[in-house]
Amino acid sequence: MKKLFIAFAVLYALAGVAQTKQLQYLSGTDAAHTVQWDFFCTAGHNSGEWKKIQVPSCWEQQGFGNYNYGRDYKTNGKNSRFYDEKGMYKYQFKVPAAWKGKNVNIVFDGSMTDTEVKINGRSAGETHRGAFYRFKYDISSLLNYDKLNTLEVTVSKMSSDASVNNAERLADYWVFGGIFRPVFLEATPKQYIDYVGIDAKADGRFAMQVWTKGLAQNAVVVTTITDATKKIISTVKTQVDKSAENTVVNTTVSSIKTWTSETPNLYTATVVLQDAAGKKLYELTEKFGFRTIEIRHGQGIYINGVQVKMKGANRHCFWPETARSLSSENQLMDALLIKEMNMNAVRCSHYPPDKYFLQLCDSLGIYVLDELAGWQKAYSTKAGELLVKEMVIRDLNHPSIIFWSNGNEGGHNKELDDDYGAYDYSKRPVIHCHHRPGNAFNGIDCNHYEDYYSTQKILNDSLIYMPTEMLHAQDDGGAGAAMEDFWNLHWRSQKSGGVFIWAL
C-alpha cells in the first residue's frame, strides 16, 4: 500500500509543471511514516541474516545491533569498546521514463555514519562521512528508466575518519546507527537553479544570490515576492550571464512586516529562470523573513534594532521509541513546548536538526542556534569543510536561524570559522558555544555553568555574555535551581544576550 501511495504521488507530481524540482521518496517521510527495506546487520542482535527494517530509523530501535553511549569509554576505561556493526540495506524502485534526460540525484537527509551508496551495482560516489547532514549523488547515468532499479546502501556505525568519531560519537549522549532521516530522489531539467541564498533586511532591502547550473545561453531570473495572503508586493527581473557561477538580485520592498520571535512574518520568493525569449526553464520557491541581526559589541544582541535576550533551551533530536529518527508530531510537540514555556530560542545541541523543525521555528517564531557537531572535539578541516557547506546550504534561508555555532565546548575547528560566510549570503554571526573562559568569539562569551557570583563578574566585563548551557542538574544544584535569580541578573544587565538552559 505504501509503495502504491508513493507511486501515485510521483504521477501526481509529474502532472504538474515539469520545470520544477520533482521528488520521489524511497523511504518514508518521517519516523511515523516509514517504508520497509531489506536489511542485514553484521553483528549484535538479529544479525547475520537478511531481514526487514523500517526506513527511516535507528537500527537499534528496530531490534538490530548493539547500543552505545558515547561516554562509555570514560566509565569503563581501557576495557571499553564501541560496537561498530554495519548495516546493509537493499531497496528496489522505478523512476518515470519522463525523467530520462534530466538530472536525477539521490538525497540522504541523515545517515549514521559512513554511508556507501550503489545503484544497480555501481558506485554512486565517494563514501559520505558525517551523520547529521544532507548529502546527495548524481545518479542520472546509473538508472534504468521505467524499469526496476536496485539501491544498495552500506552504513558503518563508526566512521573510518577518527575526527568524525571524535566530533559526533565520543560524546555525552546515546549514539546510534542507520539511515535515520528520509531518502528521496530529485529530478531537475538540465538548465536549473541549484539553490538561492536570501538576505532580507528589516528596512525592506532584499538581496538574493542565485546559483544556476547547466545554462546553454544567457538567461533571465524573474523574482516575485508575495506576502502571507499571496499578494504580490514586488517583482524584479535580473539578467544572468551563462558563464557566471551566480547572479545577485537586488530590490527594496516597502511597507514590509518584519520577522521576530513575536512577529514571525514570512514571505515567499518565487524565482523563475527564463531563456532570452521568455520561455520558462525552471522555477523554485523559498520562504524567508525580513530581519536584521546585529552584535553591538559591549552592548548586546539586536534584532531589527531592538535589543533581544534569549530565553532558550538546548534540544536534542530524540524520542524514546525512535531515538534520533523523529516524526513530524514529535517535532511540533517540542516547538510548541518551547513557545508554551514562554521561551523564544533554542540551541540545536549538538548537531543540525531535521529541516522540518527549522520550518516550525520559522512559522512559530523561535530564534535558533544551528550547530555543527563537535562535542568537545572537532572535525578535521578536511572533513569539516564539506559538512559546514552541507549544513549551511540546507539551512541558509531560515529566518529563525540567527547564529551558526561552530561546535561545542572546545569542539571548535577555528579554521572553519570563515567557511560559514562563504555559503551564507546573509553573513550571520558565528559563535563558539564553550565551557572554558577565554574562548569568546565575535564579541560574545558563551561560557557554560558559571555560578551566581562568577556570572555577575562576567556580566560586568566588556563582552556580551550569553551562556549557551546553564542549570544542568549535575552542575548547578538541581535542574532549574535558582533560575529566577540567574535570569534577573541577565535581565538587568545591558551586556547580557540571554541564556540557554540544559535541557529541553
Regions found by a protein language model. Give the residues of each.
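Beta-strand-rich binding/interaction modules
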Residues: 117-119, 205-241, 247-249
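Conserved, mostly hydrophobic/aromatic
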Residues: 121, 183, 267, 305, ...
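Accessory carbohydrate-binding/adhesion or oligomerization-edge regions at the termini
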Residues: 19-71, 154-158, 163, 228, ...
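Bacterial Sec-dependent N-terminal signal peptides
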Residues: 1-22
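N-terminal carbohydrate-binding accessory modules
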Residues: 22-29, 196-199, 258, 270-339
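Accessory beta-strand-rich segments of carbohydrate-active enzymes
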Residues: 40-44, 79, 84-193, 215, ...
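Surface beta-strand/loop "capping" patches
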Residues: 187-216
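Substrate-binding/catalytic cleft of secreted carbohydrate-active enzymes
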Residues: 335-338, 345-504
